[in-house]
Amino acid sequence: LGSFRLEDVTPGQWEVQVAALGYAAYTEVLEVGVTQVVELDIRLERSALILEGIEVEAERSRDRVRFEELGGATVRELDLDEIRVVPGVAEPDPVRAIEVLPGVVSTSDFSAAFHVRGGSQDQNLILLDGVPIFSPFHLGGLFSVFNADMIDRVELLSGGFAAEHGGRVSSVLEIESDAGTGEFSGDAAISLLSSRVAVGGRLPDAVARSLGYANIRYRLSARRSYFDVLFKPAFEFPYHLTDLQTVVEGWTPSGDRLTVTAYTGRDVFDLTQIEDGGFPFRIDWNWGNDAMGVRWSRARRGGGSLDIRANASSYDNGLLFPDFGDTDFSSDIQQAQIRADLDTRPTRYWGVQVGSSVERMEYETSFSTGGTTFGGGDSHGWLFGNYAQARYSLPRRWLVELGVRADAYNPAVGNVVFEPSPRVALKRFYRNGDLAAKVAAGRYTQFVHSLRDEELPLGLDIWIISDENVPHTVSDQVQFGLEGWHDIDWFWSIEGYYRSFNGVVTFNTADNPNDPTDDILGGRGTSWGADVMIRKETGEVNGWLAVSFLKAQRKFPDLLSPLTPAPEVMYPPIFDRRVDLDFVMSYPGPWGWTGGLRWNLGTGIPYTRAIGSHAYYSPRYVGGGGLDWTGDGDSSGTRGYGVVLADRNSTRYPLYHRLDVSFRRSFSKGWGALTPYVNLVNVYNQRNVLFYFYQYEEDPPVRSGISMFPVLPTLGLEISF
């Protein structure tokens, strides 16, 4: 499936030859007139080729192609080999791996949630083959739901993305599934965390033809943790996770492509099976995602394509406390979308892309105890998006991108919101196309939010959508920088940026329990900084250095203040890591082993420090009309301690740094390959602080810290056949 266009052809007789590996050569003689436009449809017939040998000397870097063809967008890619090289906990993780890219901040070893250039984690649009995934994390955020064996590549757009992308304001993470080659194959693995398997192949040609396709290939995978099964004879292990994912790709004889992607996954943490007297705090916590998408693509004559997509996605979680009057909390969100995108190439220098989408979003939250519902809410809304963008390219000289996106949001409660979002990018090439200066600016909008307590290392996402009581987010952004290549091996870039956020939300600590409309508080924010990257693309030793500088702020009204109007409180959010450095390297080891190394250094993230405490006392009336100060029965008469806090997030944890290494080796067998691997997290056992707690009974109070991962060795085995 492809296209070509030849212009300024001298009139006369021409012989056209087309050849492709695995197909018979095609030859045709054409007569071209002075003003004649000749259209030619070519269909190659399959033909086996007998070759003495093929030597592949080099392949064109995808990073080089993006450098030449993208204007202002900041795009970083990791392929499967790079994902596997980055050391991790237990097994390769596509989402964990992007933490090593510039502009990406992670706040904890225990959370795979990421923050890009001063945006919160819910401001990242995460797409699996174009299907949005709301909360793609297992075990409270410890690692992601994506099976690395099903992934072809991961692409992060951390800024300056074009008008075709809407719905989030911070970044776009595109995860592309691998449909396989059509040959029957499989991958299986077992780690300390889970076991997984993925198989792929193609339907028989007769079956494919009966469905109207030239060929249909597929790949499906399953993953499950196994501790609950392993320990079941001895005791009930309370946790397990499951993932199921599939991708099916069909090609019609005319070259159209139909792709179907589906995913379902769930976590279950069940302590309700323990007898009442055996455990004082029983809970039943389960959460998961479901997603499905269909995409039809047709290549157009002269270049470009037409894509029509439909998808649906949902996320839900529930938390039950049976020992507290069956206290139950639940939250879920659903979305369904239909969209069409048309890409055309009217001339050799110009490209035009237009698209439209219709999306319905719905959420519901509830809180009940003792059979009575005390809180919660639900709402729905329709989002209509349209965009148009034009691209002018003068190879090795100029790249200009102009676009506009228009979003119309119709909530169930409130008025229709219309947000135009202009976007522009300019790129100028120098030094024969090896150096480029670029600038991009645009507006981005978002109508969905996730609420979570930023102080909790294991988060529980509560998704809500905008309405008359919940503002939508508007972010104006500008970025500029230089990037270039040195030979074919080295790529470097430096970018600065500024972002404003209007309509960020948080819980309202001063809400009126009798007023259901004041649960959410809207505010503003800013972020600015710079990202630097140096990357070696080829050779046995390769890798990159990424350095990020960031300053982020949030501003909300202080409704607890007695002043009118309420003063505003400005503070750095928890993901305001001022300096973040990542060094990643892949290198050959002895005896055929391949080593991977990651060293991460970051300044401390902010927290709210306790600066004092005081005892609580309570009066008791006694006989004779007097007062007696009493407490919990001891001589002090205290009833606990109150804590005096400093300004919000005005103190920072100590410097964070950690070294991780990995080792892999493949052993080829007649039927496939065995690949054992070892990961060693936090090699020198750095005690990075997760949070502090205080013992106020001591005088003076004693501060203690809870650390993140200690030195943590893990191993696993991968099988390919």
Where are these regions (language model features)?
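A short, solvent-exposed loop/turn motif at the edges and junctions
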Residues: 13, 17-29, 225
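Periplasmic N-terminal accessory/gating domains of Gram-negative outer-membrane beta-barrel systems
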Residues: 24, 30-39, 43, 52-162, ...
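Transmembrane beta-barrel wall of Gram-negative outer-membrane proteins
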Residues: 187, 193-226, 235-268, 283-307, ...
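Structural signature of Gram-negative outer-membrane beta-barrels, strongest in the C-terminal barrel
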Residues: 261-263, 345, 349-351, 377-500, ...
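Surface-exposed extracellular loop regions of Gram-negative outer-membrane beta-barrel proteins
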Residues: 266-268, 362-367, 426-477, 498-519, ...
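Outer-membrane beta-barrel signature, preferentially recognizing the C-terminal barrel domain
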Residues: 277-296, 379, 443-493, 498-501, ...
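Gram-negative outer-membrane beta-barrel transporters
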Residues: 394-400, 497-500, 520-609
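C-terminal beta-signal and adjacent terminal beta-strands/loops
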Residues: 592, 600-640, 652-660, 664-721
